[in-house]
Amino acid sequence: MPLRLSSLFLRTLREDPVDADVDSHKLLVRAGYIRRAAPGIYTWLPLGLAVLRRVEGIVREEMDAIGAQEVHFPALLPREPYEASNRWTEYGENLFRLQDRKGADYLLAPTHEEMFTLLVKDMYSSYKDLPVMLYQIQTKYRDEARPRAGLLRGREFIMKDSYSFDVDDAGLDDAYAKHRAAYVRIFERLGLPVVAVSATSGAMGGSRSEEFMHPSVVGEDTFVRSAGGYAANVEAVTTVVPEPVDCTDAPAAQVHRTPDSPTIDTLVSRSNELHPREGQPWTAADTLKNVLLSVSLPEGGTQLVAVGVPGDREIDLKRVEAGIGGALGIGGELEVEAASEEQLRAVPELVKGYIGPGLSREDALLGTESPTGIPYFVDPRVVPGTRWITGANVAEAHVYDLVAERDFTWDATLEACTVREGDPAPDGSGPLEIARGMEMGHVFQLGRKYAEALGLKVLDNNGKLVTVTMGSYGIGVTRALAAVAEFYHDEHGLLWPRNLSPADVHVVATGKGPEVLEAAEEIVAHLEAAGVSVLFDDRPKVSPGVKFRDAELLGVPTVLVVGRGLADGVLELKDRRSGTSRDIARDRVVAEITAELQGQEGPAAE
């Protein structure tokens, strides 16, 4: 049956919704594909659901093709499994928590690693049962602090998550490779260009991790790539570490007055004015900027840490968050922000704008072994023998020629600085180019983290209990749909790839006489009989101009106009993407459209 606009549950809008800040959000709402229910939560309307089912179908076909089996878990889950894996606390405020009438704790699932693990534990006990790959397409929930961009960053979203279970790492490698190849095929079929980038594992844990990033100016993520093939999420980029410097002839560190110099710019200016260096002027790269940060701990409360970075670099809090859990020995990603004024006042030994590690190793004021007890981490560029200007922990004073390791030490190095265009790739493949992108999919080699936490073991071929190794693989289904809408649109509306469009053809009946609608009904019936799905604009009291504007907004790739020329047995066939049109004979409509569909079944129809 055709989708008739005269009865379809649809309302198109002429104006953009006031809360929409990206084109995909504006157009999906205006075209009547989705409707906002609450911040970050959307209702799917009939046309939107039709596109969503097509996206899900592609994902399902590719998962089935690699031998994964579909299951379906509840979204409402008990607390206990997430306590066992420590993610009840690691997820922090991003987790939707609730209680039943008896006071038992539950959550709305952000992911399902624990539940998949327990299911396999409940059913399998021998190496003969493995390997196995399971997947689901299910609604997920995350309490985003600032939901934005419509479906791209919501609180409720649909995700395909799959999991592999193997006896050994070789099996995990095989499952990982199968999923990676399946993801490449999925994004090709969706018509979305992606870059596979190295990534951090965050709260998921595990070892190897890659993201599939769709380059986009509206993307929230930053990634880097080089001409030589290196690609990584900016949080996963490792700094090329300089060689240690011979400091045998370095002068002793000295404290100098530096009035009104609490910033790097003022410090450099004062240094060149009051304490000039022979041979070359001081620059920001000669300074060591020490910043106090507040880390939110999983069990509640905060931890102050100090991070020292070259003064010509800025701190990237996302990179800090990716590594600070490991540096503190806590694990997982932790939220980090600049220390508050109140937190700074609680450490009177440190003077804002003039914070430093101390005048010597014996007088250290930063580090877990120092009087403040504040863990001190430095950028990897701070290597033994490097000389710095840094704070003296006295107002309007700085230390000059403070030598790393000779005069101060640190607890650990931490990737904390913003990655810059032109920085060297860690693998030596050339300078880095920075790009914005949307994370479309993520594949993890989880290893044995969840299996150990939840006791998933099987008997191996020697009768010995071994811990199962796991992989986790996710694709944001609703985000992928939004990304397609963001990538394929113009100033008039959506431009669906043919294999995702809610219908194959949009038939528009124009003209006032009953013969026009009768002819359109007959043509639609013939198209449907030939297996062509039709969106039929049969609205009787709507002007041709409104119908044409709606056809452009809705984005079905082929538009058939029945009206002008009907008396001569001629119809108009429009290509929504190119804007071109041509006349075709009425008795050739079905043959020409079916031939066109057979030759243009996917994103190649663009």
Swiss-Prot record:
GO terms for biological process: prolyl-tRNA aminoacylation. Its EC number is 6.1.1.15. Belongs to the class-II aminoacyl-tRNA synthetase family. ProS type 1 subfamily. Catalyzes the attachment of proline to tRNA(Pro) in a two-step reaction: proline is first activated by ATP to form Pro-AMP and then transferred to the acceptor end of tRNA(Pro). As ProRS can inadvertently accommodate and process non-cognate amino acids such as alanine and cysteine, to avoid such errors it has two additional distinct editing activities against alanine. One activity is designated as 'pretransfer' editing and involves the tRNA(Pro)-independent hydrolysis of activated Ala-AMP. Consists of three domains: the N-terminal catalytic domain, the editing domain and the C-terminal anticodon-binding domain. One of its GO terms (molecular function) is aminoacyl-tRNA deacylase activity. One of its GO terms (cellular component) is cytosol. It comes from Kocuria rhizophila (strain ATCC 9341 / DSM 348 / NBRC 103217 / DC2201). PROSITE patterns: AA_TRNA_LIGASE_II. This is Proline--tRNA ligase. It is an enzyme of class 6 (ligase). NCBIfam families: PRK09194.1 (NF006625), proS_fam_II (TIGR00409). Homodimer. It catalyses: tRNA(Pro) + L-proline + ATP = L-prolyl-tRNA(Pro) + AMP + diphosphate. The lineage of its organism: Bacteria, Bacillati, Actinomycetota, Actinomycetes, Micrococcales. PANTHER family: MITOCHONDRIAL RIBOSOME PROTEIN L39/PROLYL-TRNA LIGASE FAMILY MEMBER (PTHR42753), PROLINE--TRNA LIGASE (PTHR42753:SF2). Keywords: Aminoacyl-tRNA synthetase, ATP-binding, Cytoplasm, Ligase, Nucleotide-binding, Protein biosynthesis. It is found in: Cytoplasm. It comes from the Bacteria.
